[in-house]
Amino acid sequence: MSTDHSDFTQGSILKKLSLFMLPVLGALILQAAYGAVDLLVVGRFGSTAGLSAVSTGSQILNLVTFVVTQLAMGVTVLIAWYLGEKRPEQIGAVLGGAAVVFTILSVGIFILLVGFARPISVLMQAPEEAVGLTASYVRICGGGIFFIVAYNLLSAIFRGLGDSRSPLLFVLVACIVNIAGDLILVAGFGMDAAGAAIATVLAQAVSVVLAVALLIRKKLPFAITRADFRLNPQCRKFLSIGLPLALQEFLTQLSFLALCAFVNRLGLTASSGYGVASKIVNFAMLIPSALMQSMASFVAQNVGAGDQKRAKKSVLTGIGVGLVFGCAVFALVMLKGDVLAGIFSPDAEVVQKGFEYLKGFAPETILTAILFSMLGYFNGNNKTLWVMAQGLIQTLLVRLPFAYVMSIQPNASLTKIGLAAPVSTLVGVLLNVGFYLYLDRKEKRVQRAD
């Protein structure tokens, strides 16, 4: 592997991590932007029921997307390991096996979302006026799930190769297509939530075609043969990394779906306000998410190269970068949350409800700078079972019980429900700091024994 921008085993940690993270962040910003455009256009040109439908439906789609992304993290880490170990010839089998596994996964998700869209919408306690529109949104997105899964897998492959710029291009094109689709189908033809769903699927399809074309043209340090496209031994390796992350992410997103259901019981206005707040939250979480994804690739290369000391230094660098931006976002959300909510809806009551939720959620923007940097380190170190375990504790023992108790209070408010996220993340930070110190002491004992 050449000593270029994709080699993380030497040079300034801050510079290398930042240069890799910026395109990742850019891609996440654009991805959140085209998700926000759906809500923005439906909020301006559709109905209140349509706004609620996109809010609830996108929560369901987010669950699927985030689980697929975490499963694909196993592919990213394994590719980075092989590059760090100077064994790129193994990567062809990784890519071929991943293509087969994720195709099988897509078929299962397709059947679930298309065949059970309405029961899922009812289970989510979508307001009665919005059940039909929510089911339509979920069904259409489910029909295009092959493109959504393929996009996330291809982006994971490029990041594993140390290329975070190409995924930025993919999502930029997708964003442009989605905006055009929303304006034509929702604003122009009045298709409401269904139009937003069609635009989303079309955008992902175009980005997948572009990604495949670039991968074919890219000068790769390995060969891919037809024989690689099977359930080969590499599948077990990347699944052993990705499955714990996917399960943890599934339960985390399930907890947010449950939270959405708790909010939906408070009425249509609260549901729409929460949907608006969720889009703002998606933007607020972009920097921690970019750090976690970048950290996993950065750490995996250094672990593959046998440089654990450099991998550890990158954690502190990541936390420092995250805290600077996290504090700025916290101040923005607390001081101007109502202005941000007003971007997505002209309804004063919806804006007020959205701001209520943001007030409770705001501390999360600081805490995740620490948590996500550490999780990226553990992911790159193949400590994904721990990542899963701490995630289960946060989700099942803290976030869900806290949100449920807050939602059934006589004076229930979105601010109190919003506190569930930072409270559970604080517990996660304490758990991960403890585990990091435990591993550090264990490593030092082994070194002294040697």
Feature locations, PLM:
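Transmembrane alpha-helix boundary and packing residues in multipass membrane permease domains
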Residues: V24, L28, L40, V77, ...
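Short runs within selected transmembrane alpha-helices of multi-pass transporters and secretion channels
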Residues: A72, C141-R159, P167-C175, A196-V209, ...
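N-terminal transmembrane alpha-helices
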Residues: F8-L40, R44-F45, Q59-G74, L78, ...
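Hydrophobic transmembrane alpha-helices of multi-pass small-molecule transporters
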Residues: L63-F66, N178-D182, S207-V212, F283-L286, ...
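Helix-terminus/linker motif at the lipid-water interface of multi-pass membrane proteins
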Residues: I29, A33-S52, S121-E128, I184-M191, ...
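Small-residue-rich hydrophobic transmembrane alpha-helices
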Residues: L51-I111, I148-P167, G273-G337, T368-Q390
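Short alpha-helical transmembrane segments in multi-pass integral membrane proteins
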Residues: M1-M21, I79-F146, G188-L243, V299-E364, ...
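Transmembrane helical elements of multi-pass membrane transporters/channels
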Residues: L19-D38, I140, A174, A203-S207, ...
